Amino acid sequence: VLLCNEDGLFSFIELKVVKRRASKVDLSPHQCAWLSRHGHSSSFVVVREPNLNINVFAAADVVDLRLEKFSDCEPIEVFGNPYDWEEIFRLLSPPASV
């Protein structure tokens, strides 16, 4: 997903779902390569758990997400249901620095 905030800045979000907390996030080598290459940018991996929590990870963490169990990886933020969509958008598409 490509987001554009009100300042015209773009963010990239890779959306994933895990079936169990003990499983690994299903990321292809191509996805890992792209996210690793752009880990310094406003790029994220967003993972939904079976309990519907939304976990946000920095793109720089993509290799750990692919190789380690999901439950062993530390997200930037976890959002529970009901979701605060404004806060999620603020995290995923931050405004330009003043």
Where are each of the predicted segments found?
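Conserved catalytic cores of phosphodiester-cleaving nucleases, focusing on short active-site segments
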Residues: 1-3, 8-20
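Short connector loops at helix/strand junctions that flank enzyme active sites
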Residues: 8-12, 30, 39-40
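Solvent-exposed, well-ordered amphipathic alpha-helical segments
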Residues: 8-12, 66, 89-94
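Mg2+/Mn2+-dependent nuclease catalytic core
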Residues: 18-38
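Nucleic-acid nuclease catalytic cores
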Residues: 36-64
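Acidic, Ser/Thr-rich peripheral helices and adjacent loops at domain boundaries
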Residues: 62-73
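Charged phosphate-binding loop/patch that engages nucleotide di/tri-phosphates or the phosphate backbone
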Residues: 72-98
